[in-house]
Design a protein with these regions (language model features):
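Alpha-helical assembly-interface signal, strongest on the long, hydrophobic N-terminal helix that forms
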Residues: 1-76
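Long, compositionally biased low-complexity segments
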Residues: 56, 63-486
Length: 486
């Protein structure tokens, strides 16, 4: 057998060695890069899975996503999120939370952003276009309301003094033979209605017959808007695109569609559905306040207190407009003046005719406003600005409003504004942080009926994680991952 002698040059040996080194280097780089990619894939899959564990009732009832940090156990620890990441096979990756956002952070900004995104996608901007031209008028009503409250207080105090004088005059002549002359029976007194409102509250005269005011209440100290909240950290992108006015209008429409208010079953939105028939307002939230929007506006501890406050604000607005209508109606002004002459004669104060006339006009406007509120609470509409032909209460009917039990009712004008329209205006006039945090109060109270441990400041909406993995020998690879509900 012939032997073959082989040989290789030094150059070829070196070249072959370099080639092998290059090949193995490529393979090592591929292993490292593959490990990086696999780690990212594992982490992405895990974080998507974690954020898929959103609170179901929160999403279904309020269209807002959030992870219950305690997973309904009451153990609110950020480590729970890390454990869930590992559960979803994030491998040997080491996770460290660098940023976390809760629903209540920055006065509920995260909650509000999700609501706006939902409303914009679900309904679009056409929903609020018709209101953009009225916001300036709404802002003017704040001044009118304040001025009218001051004027009404002054007038009511004056009416009380007149009533005291009339009572004193009546007691002096009682049982005595007096010459025939002007008299004013108690049931004819036009000032009693305003006196009752001041002493017993507006609810005593406006609740429709057969209707009962809710007695539900909450402990304010435990609400998200009052208690010390868990705060997130880190920097996250914020939602942009809409101007402040449009955002307020859009958010308020969400509130009107989602939350309850006084006697909503009588209103034009009684079914709690949107245009497509999808149910929105959940009327069966048994543990929630019945008048949620009134709470969002006033922030008091009971339905009765909140309704009283909202209705009195509404009463002041109506009395302002009704007084203006009366002042222009010469026929009714003459009626008021004639009654003022009678009262001044009884008081032996002829110089008091003009002040008495103004008090009678205010009381008359107050009586008409009581009728307006009865209509509104009955689900009907009233003219935004009254005209003489739309006036309902006569001067002689004022005392009847005290004893009729709500049976004296005005007619539905078929046009004008309803109770929900006034709620919309009042919501627009409140500050954004205050409205948002009280919304979260209502969300918590409603969800407590099924999940007593639910807390809005323990609901995660955005998360930033720094991840670390050993990809090869002692080589570490670090990368950030961000995820959030937008």
């Amino acid at each position: 057998m012939r032997s073959v002698k082989g040989e290789i040059t030094v150059f070829l040996s070196l070249s072959f060695t370099l080639l092998l080194s290059f090949i193995f280097g490529i393979l090592e780089s591929a292993v490292i890069q593959g490990s990086k990619n696999l780690s990212r894939i594992d982490t992405d899959r895990a974080i998507y899975s974690v954020f898929g564990e959103y609170h179901q009732e929160l999403m279904e009832q309020y269209h807002v996503f959030g992870i219950d940090l305690g997973y309904r156990t009451g153990n609110y620890e950020e480590e729970n999120l890390i454990q869930r990441l590992h559960y979803y096979n994030s491998g040997s990756t080491d996770h460290q939370i660098k940023g976390i956002q809760y629903l209540t952070d920055q006065s509920g900004q995260a909650f509000r952003e999700q609501v706006l995104a939902y409303m914009e996608q679900r309904y679009g901007m056409d929903l609020v276009k018709k209101f953009t031209g009225t916001t300036e008028k709404w802002e003017q009503t704040e001044t009118e309301e304040s001025d009218m409250e001051k004027k009404t207080d002054e007038m009511t105090d004056a009416m009380e003094r007149v009533n005291d004088s009339l009572d004193a005059s009546g007691s002096q002549t009682e049982g005595e033979d007096v010459e025939e002359g002007p008299s004013l029976l108690d049931e004819e007194n036009p000032f009693r209605i305003m006196q009752k409102i001041k002493k017993e509250g507006i609810l005593s005269v406006v609740i429709p017959k057969g209707k009962k005011v809710s007695e539900k209440s909450v402990d304010l100290s435990g609400q998200a808007s009052k208690r010390t909240l868990k705060k997130g950290y880190g920097t996250f992108p914020t939602r942009k695109g809409l101007d402040q006015t449009t955002e307020k209008l859009l958010y308020n429409e969400y509130l009107l569609k989602t939350f309850g208010y006084a006697f909503r079953q009588n209103s034009e939105q009684s079914e709690g559905t949107d245009e497509s028939g999808e149910k929105e307002w959940q009327s069966d939230r048994s543990d929630a306040l019945a008048y949620e929007l009134e709470y969002i506006l006033q922030g008091k501890g009971s339905d009765k207190e909140n309704l009283e406050s909202v209705l009195f604000r509404l009463f002041l607005l109506r009395i302002s407009g009704n007084y203006g209508c009366l002042a222009k109606d010469m026929g009714r002004v003459a009626e008021a003046e004639a009654l003022a002459v009678t009262i001044s004669a009884l008081l032996l104060m002829p110089e008091a005719v003009e002040p008495l006339k103004q008090m009678i006009l205010v009381a008359w406007a107050g009586g008409e406003s009581v009728m307006d509120l009865r209509c509104l609470l009955d689900g009907r509409k009233v003219p935004l600005v009254k005209s003489a032909d739309k006036w309902v209460v006569s001067l002689s009917q004022l005392p009847l409003l005290l004893t009729d039990g709500g049976s004296v009712r005005g007619n539905d004008s078929g046009e004008g504004v309803g109770y929900s329209d006034y709620i919309r205006m009042f919501l627009f006039l409140k500050s954004v942080p205050e409205i948002t945090m009280r919304t979260l109060d209502c969300v918590e109270v409603a969800l407590h009926s099924k999940h007593i441990l639910f807390q809005a400041d323990q609901c995660v909406t955005k998360l930033e994680i720094q991840n670390k993995i050993i990809v090869y020998k002692n080589l570490n690879y670090q990368y950030p991952v961000y995820f959030g509900y937008e």
